[in-house]
From Swiss-Prot:
It is an enzyme of class 5 (isomerase). Pathway: Amino-acid biosynthesis; L-methionine biosynthesis via salvage pathway; L-methionine from S-methyl-5-thio-alpha-D-ribose 1-phosphate: step 1/6. It comes from Synechocystis sp. (strain ATCC 27184 / PCC 6803 / Kazusa). NCBIfam families: eIF-2B_rel, PRK05720.1, salvage_mtnA. The active site is at D246 (proton donor). This is Methylthioribose-1-phosphate isomerase. The record marks C166 as: Transition state stabilizer.
Length: 351
């Protein structure tokens, strides 16, 4: 049975009792289970196996993973400490290739190691503080994204039906959520009638996680299979689409969970606004466009053997990309903590 959990208390990554506590998202919604992580190897496995997932949450988890790795380093010599910490960073970078927040957070932690503290113990303390700050900043960022999203949602009808894909909620961030943050803000303002949640094959994050979050929050939610979205749009059941992003190129192309591109095409066809909600830390200004975003391919067992039950005969081949790229031309606006931005204006924000 699902443990009763208040939405406001859903924090997928926490620092508690000198270790990291993760909500095991592979067990939701049937079981609410927390997992204690005490070393960077365990954190790397948790990220790769999707115990923790969602680009911002992965970034927070990686930051704590860096501290866990630093804590275990025995040397007191600064140069050797940095060398060993860079090894930890390399191991964590290999866990998930698409979500840029992971790389951003690791770089933030390395920057602390390079430029703060006069001794190793001081650097270790600074690394823990930095990880905690990354977590706090992301929570505040998500709240700001929610407020910014509320401002750009369609004015009519007053109560909207919003379609979302995968899970860009509290479970995918430090808390509150990006796309679900916008939905939550709309619900609090009396502007939301209902959420339609794609199940999101093959991992079913929509069915398992987004629906779970909405139920916890008391938000009306309707689950649909991915191939029902076009019909729902044609029947005028959808007023707006709001999704998250795992990486955004400087031209406004975005990589998000597989199936997002198809939704954007459908939304364009039906003249439905398509919004992407993500923090600026998800923008990779080093990439000119979405063709340069690395796309993770996962074990095909996720396709042919969902929930441990094989559904496809032997002899077939499989293709299991975890993400696809949505061109900027299909996106109405990218909702960030600094407000909603037209995709073509994103490069103007580069520091």
């Amino acid at each position: 049975m699902t443990q009763s959990t208040n939405f406001d208390d859903v924090y997928p990554v926490q620092w508690r009792d000198d270790q990291v506590i993760l909500i095991d998202q592979t067990r939701l919604p049937l079981e609410y289970k927390e997992v204690a992580i005490a070393d960077y190897e365990a954190m790397g496995h948790a990220i790769k196996s999707m115990v923790v997932r969602g680009a911002p949450a992965i970034g927070v988890a990686a930051a704590y993973g860096m501290y866990l790795g630093a804590r275990r380093i025995q040397t007191t010599e600064l140069r050797e400490f940095v060398v060993q910490l860079e090894f930890v960073a390399d191991q964590l970078r290999q866990t998930r290739p698409t979500a840029v927040n992971l790389f951003w957070a690791i770089d933030q932690m390395l920057n602390v190691a390079y430029h703060s503290g006069e001794n190793v113990e001081q650097i270790k303390a600074n690394l823990l503080s930095q990880a905690q700050q990354i977590q706090l900043d992301d929570l505040r960022t998500c709240q700001a994204i929610g407020a910014a999203g509320l401002e750009v949602l369609p004015r009519e009808p007053h109560q909207l039906t919003i379609l979302t894909h995968c899970n860009a909620g509290a479970l995918a961030t430090a808390g509150y959520g990006t796309a679900i943050g916008v939905i939550r803000a709309a619900w609090s303002a009396g502007r939301l009638a209902r959420v339609y949640a794609d199940e999101t094959r093959p991992r079913l994050q929509g069915a398992k996680l987004t629906v779970w979050e909405c139920v916890q929050a008391g938000i009306p939610v309707t689950l649909i299979t991915d191939n029902m979205a076009a019909h729902c749009m044609q029947q005028q059941r959808i007023d707006a689409v709001v999704v998250g992003a795992d990486r955004i190129a400087r031209n406004g192309d975005i990589a998000n969970k597989i199936g997002t591109y198809g939704l954007a095409v459908l939304a364009k066809m039906h003249a439905i606004p398509f919004f992407v909600a993500a923090p600026l830390s998800t923008v990779d200004f080093a990439l000119d466009d979405g063709s340069q975003i690395p796309i993770e391919e996962r074990d095909p067992v996720e396709i042919y053997q969902p929930e441990g039950n094989r559904i496809t005969p032997e002899g077939a081949e499989f293709y299991n990309p975890a993400f696809d790229v949505t061109p900027a031309s299909l996106i109405t606006a990218i909702i960030t903590e600094q407000g909603a931005i037209a995709p073509e204006k994103l490069a103007d924000l580069q520091a």
